[in-house]
UniProtKB/Swiss-Prot annotation:
One of its GO terms (molecular function) is structural constituent of ribosome. This is Small ribosomal subunit protein uS12. It comes from the Bacteria. Part of the 30S ribosomal subunit. Contacts proteins S8 and S17. May interact with IF1 in the 30S initiation complex. The keyword RNA-binding applies. GO terms for biological process: translation. With S4 and S5 plays an important role in translational accuracy. It holds the Pfam family Ribosom_S12_S23. Keywords: Methylation, Ribonucleoprotein, Ribosomal protein, RNA-binding, rRNA-binding, tRNA-binding. One of its GO terms (cellular component) is small ribosomal subunit. Signal peptide: none annotated. Belongs to the universal ribosomal protein uS12 family. The modification 3-methylthioaspartic acid is found at D89. It comes from Clostridium botulinum (strain Hall / ATCC 3502 / NCTC 13319 / Type A).
Amino acid sequence: MPTISQLVRKGRKTIASASDSPALKECPQKRGVCTVVKTTTPKKPNSALRKVARIRLTNGYEVTAYIPGVGHNLQEHSVVLIRGGRVKDLPGVRYHIVRGALDAAGVANRMQSRSKYGAKKPKQK
């Protein structure tokens, strides 16, 4: 335990916490280009084919991002917007693609939680 005079001389060091999404560099979203679009399997005990994309960001980082929703139109060279947010059962996936922005189309026929999936309000008859 330090003495008062030691604290006056040196002070206390603050521990800097590591960012959950370092590639964003404190930005809310970043733009990038898809280099690979593929499916991966989640870790135990889950089982599925999760859609992910490898993305080269405008700041030079290359990250893996999850493609949410049912079906997508992404392929190599698609320009996408990514946000932070990990996928718990996919190791190394710390970002989500924003649906309905840039080249990523919104989810078709989505009625609930539409804003999260970039779906337009259906026409009333």
